[in-house]
């Protein structure tokens, strides 16, 4: 069974590039605590080593019955364009397909040429080269 704590740790460890946990009892509190810890850990809150920066102010977790929806706002911050085939991050075992349902939605800033694939081994990769400076939102829904 997946739980909020492990989802938050995955966000912190894999996407936010920090070892984070939470003691919050509500989803709003968990996001606030996660954002607070991240901002204290790095000069660039949410910055990942692989060219992805998370905007924690636009990040949310919402629980509906047996699913948790995680909405993440990213910005590409790599100095050079990220090449096609680059793995942006890897879902941990408990959150790989088919446990991730409706895995990805994007905001309007992404054109059709900037595509991603989520593979059954849990890797989330670019299909095409992506320039720096793009902002996009992805929504993942986890079963819990």
Report residues per predicted region.
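Extracellular/surface recognition and adhesion modules
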Residues: 27-31, 68-70, 91
